[in-house]
Amino acid sequence: MTHHSLKHISDRIKQALNQIENRNLAQDLWYILGEQNFQGFLPAFTVNHFCEKYHMTDKELALILLPVSACYANPTISHFSVGAIAKGESGSFYFGANQEFCTTNIQQTVHAEQSAISHAWMRRESKITEITVNYTPCGHCRQFMNELNSAETLRIHLPHSQDNLLHHYLPDAFGPHNLQIDNRLFDKKAHNLFFVTEDPLIQAALDAANQSHAPYSKTYSGIALQLQDQQIFQGSYAENAAFNPSLPPLQTALNYLLLNGNEVENIARAVLVEQPFRLSYRGMTEELLAYLGDIPLDYIQVS
């Protein structure tokens, strides 16, 4: 599915780091990212270390890192790489980039801001405080961010303009409050979905479904992908008050897998656990898995 001539993420990151003027910073970033197998994530203590060592703010560091984040993009349709970095309440940085899939419908696409935010969500961040992106967020992403539990205070940084509130880009916004929904994306969930299993992949998918954000349809859905080396990556459904900017569970999981420096070609198994109240993501999930390499889907319906 990759569009890049430099296929491995390490090659793309090395090329991006070569463009950073501060060579010592570039070398430090190369070492840190290599040590963590090119996971697109910097814990708070690493962010603080870089800021202190190189006398910069975390906002300045995030702007420098945007080309590195964009290395994780798979722009197979647009040939246009977008990078984003979500800063969590913890102080950690979560990279994100656009993920596109040919030969299926364009609604399967993951935007860079969705990528960074869902990456943070899967790493159990509690709140997003800032997001840095190399291009102005599109309307789809503005609406997606409006679902966050930090929407009212979320700050957006662009190369040409920093410290703007989300609602500067989305005035008079329609959101969860219009539908009398108080629980937001990143708030804790308690769906109490239950299924007896000793299979760790099924349990991971069940846990992802129990974490899903679906206050409008009540279709709680989660997926787990197992790689050939037995690593497991979860994805939870992130629903949106405007419906169409919702992020399906498979996209969340694929994005998490890719942002951890892995390849979709290494997926061996997939399990979707779902309470299909008004919707179902089974068909859409099977369609995309077929494109990715005829990966069979185990589907488990719970209540």
UniProtKB/Swiss-Prot annotation:
Gene3D superfamilies: Cytidine Deaminase, domain 2. It comes from the Bacteria. It is an enzyme of class 3 (hydrolase). One of its GO terms (biological process) is cytidine deamination. Its cofactor is Zn(2+). Substrate binds at N98, Q99, E100. Coiled coil: none annotated. Residues 57-172, 196-303 form the CMP/dCMP-type deaminase domain. The active site is at E113 (proton donor). One of its GO terms (cellular component) is cytosol. Binds 1 zinc ion. InterPro entries: APOBEC/CMP_deaminase_Zn-bd, CMP_dCMP_dom, Cyd/dCyd_deaminase_Zn-bd, Cyt/Deoxycyt_deaminase, Cyt_deam_dimer, Cytidine_deaminase-like, Cytidine_deaminase_bacteria. Keywords: Hydrolase, Metal-binding, Zinc. PANTHER family: CYTIDINE DEAMINASE (PTHR11644:SF2). This is Cytidine deaminase. It comes from Histophilus somni (strain 129Pt).
